[in-house]
From Swiss-Prot:
The gene is rpsQ. CDD domains: Ribosomal_uS17. One of its GO terms (cellular component) is cytosolic small ribosomal subunit. It comes from Aliivibrio salmonicida (strain LFI1238). InterPro entries: NA-bd_OB-fold, Ribosomal_uS17, Ribosomal_uS17_bact/chlr, Ribosomal_uS17_CS. Belongs to the universal ribosomal protein uS17 family. This is Small ribosomal subunit protein uS17. One of its GO terms (biological process) is translation. NCBIfam families: PRK05610.1, uS17_bact.
Length: 84
């Protein structure tokens, strides 16, 4: 029985740490009463081994074993570099 590896796509909002990035994942949630769809954001800390990401990059991350107190995701690839 194999587990499915969780992957997420999001935008880098911080790259100030060494070998770490903060990725914002946006999702649409329906309001329980009014029925309107609302954007909700989740911030995840991810491991960036080569410090190749910059702020604003669109990236794919995957879940891994805990690397620190808050970091349990790692960078898979950069989908789109931010325009400088």
């Amino acid at each position: 029985m194999s587990e499915k590896i969780r992957t997420m796509q999001g935008r880098v909002i911080s790259d100030k740490m060494d070998k770490s990035i903060v990725v914002a994942i946006e999702r649409m949630v329906k309001h329980p009463i009014y029925g309107k769809y609302i954007k909700r954001t989740t911030k995840l800390h991810a491991h960036d081994e080569n410090n190749e990401c910059g702020q604003g990059d669109l990236v794919v991350i995957r879940e891994c074993r805990p690397l620190s107190k808050t970091k349990s995701w790692t960078l898979v690839n950069i989908v789109e570099k931010a325009k400088a």
